[in-house]
Amino acid sequence: GQLNYFVGRDFYNSKMKYKNPPIPKDVIGFDLYINWDEPIVLCEGVFDAIAIKRNAIPMFGKTIPKKLFKKIIEKNVKKVFLMLDEDAKSDSIKITENLINFGIDVIYIAMEDGDPSDLGYERSLELIKSSREITFKELIGHKLNGKTKRYMEI
């Protein structure tokens, strides 16, 4: 195959942990390994997806690439788990709203203890298993309040 994307990672605890190339991010990471008939997990980075292991797709940032969004709709995905970093809550709400508008069940997972690559597979799996779907009422409430609140108890 051909290289379609890469990312660098700093292991010396600098402020910027990851470095993405200055190219378009309209790539679907691990596309060949995704079972589109099963629930998918959307996360920010490649290392997050690797830590989650099963049906995880890196978005290469805090927003969902158009190509990925289109494929989720075309493949008629029924359920999406959203595991974005703590600093991406407002982006999570936008993604959730867009997916709900297409009839997709969204389960937002509050990542208050770090990102999936920090937590590892076991803890990420625990969070997925203990999560619940966001209701339309909760989404509207958030938008009206203009505040981010947790949608699940951990």
Which ranges hold each PLM region?
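Alpha-helix N-cap/loop-to-helix initiation residues
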Residues: 65, 88-90
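Short glycine-centered, acidic/aromatic-flanked micro-motifs in structured strand/loop junctions
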Residues: 59, 84-86
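Replication-associated primase and helicase/ATPase modules
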Residues: 41-42, 73, 77-83, 92-154
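Extracytoplasmic/secreted cell-surface and envelope-processing proteins
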Residues: 51, 90-92
